[in-house]
Swiss-Prot record:
Redox regulated molecular chaperone. Protects both thermally unfolding and oxidatively damaged proteins from irreversible aggregation. Plays an important role in the bacterial defense system toward oxidative stress. InterPro entries: Heat_shock_Hsp33, Heat_shock_Hsp33_C, Heat_shock_Hsp33_N, Hsp33_helix_hairpin_bin_dom_sf. PANTHER family: 33 KDA CHAPERONIN (PTHR30111:SF1). Its main location: cytoplasm. This is 33 kDa chaperonin. One of its GO terms (biological process) is protein refolding. GO terms for cellular component: cytoplasm. Pfam families: HSP33. Gene3D superfamilies: helix hairpin bin, Hsp33 domain, HSP33 redox switch-like.
Length: 292
């Protein structure tokens, strides 16, 4: 795994503000490889990857976050899913031509930002905001302003790094239930906004923080690796087939002689023939008998 694919948490000793810094290269490339995405779509997936990593780092529980853009433009949907272990996957779907250099609004059109938080234990939460900002970072800040009520700023950069294509970002957020000065927070945000793409992508986290906040006392914690990992499996696809009406499954078998289950996230294919389907039904019947 690339040394670059890491998420760092940090705290300001004299301000009730926390920060997160993430840089990704290999993970981003693994998400877009095998897909013929135009450059603007690759870039928005990189930015979504950075945003999802930063948001999952705010989780206080085991679970995952999905950050999705959807609209009526040529980019119908772009989504990244990540969990508290910083395991990421993502995909985009297009419904028209996307020109080189297209902006977020030109790609999505009239659309929404949907953030779904799914704890392993407890209820799922979903927040939806209209895409009113010109950038993904601006749209995410709008989401935080409407839902969390915690002052939050995001800074996302992408471009060519020393080791190839890279993306990175920084999240600043006032700590909850603490008396934080908004002036102090805005001052730290102004400092953070000066980060250059090449600095964020190529320098170690310690050096980035020193360049931004050398007059502040900052505690930098151990990094967490960010990686690509798809949760699909033959077993999971089999469970999906079990939920379908038997006559629908039989019709698919008659038409093609097999059922091909394709994972859009990683490109894996899982093929089931009549023998496989019979085995799935036998297993399902055995499980039902054990339950009763």
């Amino acid at each position: 795994m690339s040394q670059q694919d890491q998420m760092h948490r940090y705290l300001f000793e004299n301000h009730a503000v926390r920060g997160e810094l993430v840089t990704v290269s290999q993970t981003w490339n693994e998400i877009i490889q095998g897909h013929d995405y135009p450059q603007p779509v690759q870039q928005i997936l990189g930015e979504l990857l950075v945003a999802t990593s930063l948001l999952t780092a705010t989780l206080k529980f085991d679970g995952d976050i999905t950050v999705q853009l959807q609209g009526d433009g040529p980019l119908k949907m772009a989504v990244i899913n990540g969990n508290n272990r910083q395991e990421m996957r993502g995909v985009a779907r297009m419904q028209g031509e996307i020109a080189e250099g297209s902006s977020l609004k030109e790609m999505i059109g009239n659309g929404y930002l949907v953030i779904t938080i799914s704890p392993e234990v407890g209820e799922r939460y979903q927040g939806v905001v209209g895409l009113e900002g010109d950038t993904l970072a601006a749209c995410l800040e709008d989401y935080f302003m409407r839902s969390e009520q915690l002052p939050t700023r995001l800074f996302i950069r992408s471009g060519e790094a020393e080791k190839g294509l890279g993306a990175g970002g920084i999240l600043l957020q006032v700590l909850p239930a603490q008396d934080a000065s908004l002036d102090d927070f805005n001052h730290l945000a102004t400092l953070t906004e000066t980060i250059k793409t090449e600095e964020l992508l190529d320098l170690p986290a310690h050096d980035v923080l020193w360049r931004l906040y050398h007059q502040e006392e900052v505690t930098l914690f151990d990094p967490q690796a960010v990686s690509f990992k798809c949760s699909c499996s033959r077993q999971r696809c089999g469970e999906v087939l079990r939920t379908l009406p038997p006559e629908e499954v039989d019709q698919m078998l008659q038409e093609d002689g097999h059922i091909d289950m394709h994972c859009d996230y990683c490109g894996n294919n899982y093929v089931y023939d009549a023998v496989d389907i019979a085995a799935l039904r036998t297993d399902s019947a055995d499980n039902d008998r054990q339950v009763h």
